[in-house]
């Protein structure tokens, strides 16, 4: 069978990341929130997106609600699928970042290996790891979805913080304890490190 030689690489004709960042007047970056369930990751992510939007900056939030029901709806919560879940999230995030979009991810991502994998895929220079360090006792007290109660009763297996471990990041760009900091304080601290990273200096 004759080999098809009619497929040619088109990367030399594609617009570059720089072209897109110049159009958007911003730099793409990954803001990766990690922490226990109920620590405040998604709440802070949403508030941060609103503040960046007010400043004319384009963002995209990725979290369990829009990932597990979409691109990763065929994955279980087995160890292998949890790793694949994060791998896919990182690959999708890289596409957004290469388009100049500020990408905000809020996932438990419970160990250093899995987060380091995400950072390698995205690229360490574009990866800001934010540890929402709210203590387990406070997360369990909030328990908005009743997940901790179910985990304590043994109804949920391998639940991070109860029956499965959580490894705190070794060198996060920022640590936020929402049992101490208000939402406004948390977002202000984030803006201090995020705005210099996403601003283009012409």
Curated annotation (Swiss-Prot):
Gene Ontology terms, MF aspect: adenylylsulfate kinase activity; ATP binding
CDD domains documented for this protein: APSK (cd02027)
InterPro entries: APS_kinase, P-loop_NTPase
Keyword ATP-binding attributed: yes
Keyword hit for ATP-binding: yes
Gene Ontology terms: biological process: hydrogen sulfide biosynthetic process; sulfate assimilation
Keywords for the protein's UniProt record, in alphabetical order: ATP-binding, Kinase, Nucleotide-binding, Phosphoprotein, Transferase
Gene3D superfamilies: P-loop containing nucleotide triphosphate hydrolases
Top EC category: transferase
Active site (catalytic residues): 109 (phosphoserine intermediate)
Amino acids binding ATP: 35-42
Pathway membership: Sulfur metabolism; hydrogen sulfide biosynthesis; sulfite from sulfate: step 2/3
Top-level taxon in the UniProt lineage: Bacteria
Reactions catalysed according to its record: adenosine 5'-phosphosulfate + ATP = 3'-phosphoadenylyl sulfate + ADP + H(+)
One Pfam short name: APS_kinase
This enzyme's EC code(s): 2.7.1.25
NCBIfam families (alphabetical): apsK (TIGR00455), PRK03846.1 (NF003013)
Function: Catalyzes the synthesis of activated sulfate.
Family named by the database record: Belongs to the APS kinase family.
Protein name per the record: Adenylyl-sulfate kinase
Lineage of producing organism: Bacteria, Pseudomonadati, Bacteroidota, Bacteroidia, Bacteroidales
């Amino acid at each position: 069978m004759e080999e098809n030689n009619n497929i040619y690489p088109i990367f030399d004709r594609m617009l570059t990341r720089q072209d897109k960042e110049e159009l958007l007047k911003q730099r793409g970056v990954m803001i990766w929130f990690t922490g226990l369930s109920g620590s405040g990751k998604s709440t802070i992510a949403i508030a941060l997106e609103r503040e960046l939007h007010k400043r004319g900056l384009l963002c995209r939030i990725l979290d369990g609600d829009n990932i597990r029901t979409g691109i990763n709806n065929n994955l279980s919560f087995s160890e292998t699928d949890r790793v694949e879940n994060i791998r896919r999230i990182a690959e999708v995030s890289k596409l957004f970042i290469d388009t100049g979009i500020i990408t905000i991810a809020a996932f438990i991502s419970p160990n250093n290996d899995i987060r380091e994998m995400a950072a390698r895929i995205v690229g360490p220079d574009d990866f800001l790891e934010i540890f929402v360090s709210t203590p387990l006792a406070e997360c369990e007290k909030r328990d908005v979805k009743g997940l901790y109660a179910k985990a304590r009763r043994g109804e949920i297996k391998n639940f991070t913080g109860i029956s499965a471990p959580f490894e705190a990041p070794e060198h996060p760009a920022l640590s936020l304890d929402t049992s101490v900091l208000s939402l406004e304080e948390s977002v202000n601290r984030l803006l201090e490190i995020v705005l210099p990273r996403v601003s283009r200096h012409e």
